[in-house]
Amino acid sequence: MTRDLTVGSPIKLIISFALPMIMGNLFQQMYNVVDTIVVGQFVGKNALASVSSAYTIMVFITSIIIGLCMGAAILWAQLFGAGDYKQLKRALTTSGIFIIIVTFCMMLLSLVGIEYILRFMNIPYELYADTKMYLQIIFCGLIFTFLYNIVASLLRALGDSKTPLYFLVLSAMLNIILDILFVLGLEWGVKGVAVATFIAQGIAAILCLLYAYKHYEILHITKKEFIFDISLFKVIAKYSILTSIQQSIMNFGILLVQGLVNSFGTVAMAAFGAAVKIEGFAYMPVQDFGNAFATYVAQNKGAQKASRIQEGVKCVVKLSSFFCVIISAVVFIGAKELMLIFISSSEYEVLNIGIEYLRVIAPFYVLIGFLFMFYGLYRGLGTMKLSIILTIISLGTRVILAYVLARIEYIGLIGIWWAVPIGWALADGVGYKFYSQIKKRTLNL
């Protein structure tokens, strides 16, 4: 069912639209989290480190595809908000052709260049074989990543954030069952969790496409309507490539930090891998408030309702602040209990490093909440360059400070942790300055 976000209470619309996205993101995170828990508890520390490092690489590669879909969805939402369904169909076919070509290129390049990727990441020798095998299987499933995300992005652009959730729930449940079967039953180890993820993602992608085609007339595209529109492609390429650059810069920065952590050994890798999973869950609600806000802004821009965009900014700031205060307290106080989900209590060093990371980062979640709001605002307005600038400031600060501080003998790992909130704070300051400038010309949005 489509939803018009240009009428009604902004705060109610954003919450109701974001909740299914939060649940969907929760279950999407479950793919690797379940893999991490299973290998951490039943295979061992080295397997946990392998899957954690592989996950960082996987997220970087898939973020390019996801970014392309998210960028194209901004144009789809604007056309839907304007009621221009003929152009919307043209935009869909043009986007689909463009993104699937990029996906196949990414799949081939990733498989061919996997050795270079692993060397760049400083993967220790004892983890090399498992990490390589995990990634090879995951890279073969990039076509499913494309398929699911382009359909899910379309449905969200039309105001339907529930349907993608249902298929992610199904897929996550299947992933858990297959993890248990392949790892505990067949004793396949790291290979087992990779195969489970591949199968589960494939089923979710295919079923989501079939359901959407059956229930959404906009997907019933005839041969005559199947057009690659050059003029639309220029707009789509601008939105998609800029959003993809933002996503890939974000994850490339994390990739560089992961490489730095890897240089501290397997214990640090395992701790960082588990702590980052917890962190991902912690700020997931505010991330999806930002994603929901992007669709809200795009539809209202298409409908030329600038005042509602300003109302939406105030709503998202309040929502993000409320959630971040609660989540920060939970993570800070429960850091040890959260780490024990991923690693055995006998791994004292791993536990202590992970707890330290979480207690440094947790008090500052409100900063990342505001940053996601700015990302959503500028993406929805179609000013993706501003989002890229904020991402470069945030991640650039984090990476540079991490490499500088980590090399100081009496600081070490904790310097990597403190670089994170400093990067968030600087990006928020610049983001607010951009917003102040845009507010002055709001009526021209």
Task: Please provide the spans of the model-predicted regions.
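Residue-level signal for short hydrophobic patches within transmembrane helices
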Residues: 7, 11-30, 34, 57, ...
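Small-residue hotspots at the loop-to-helix junctions and early N-terminal turns
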Residues: 45-56, 135, 194, 266-281, ...
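Short alpha-helical transmembrane segments in multi-pass integral membrane proteins
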Residues: 1-18, 76-141, 187-241, 297-364, ...
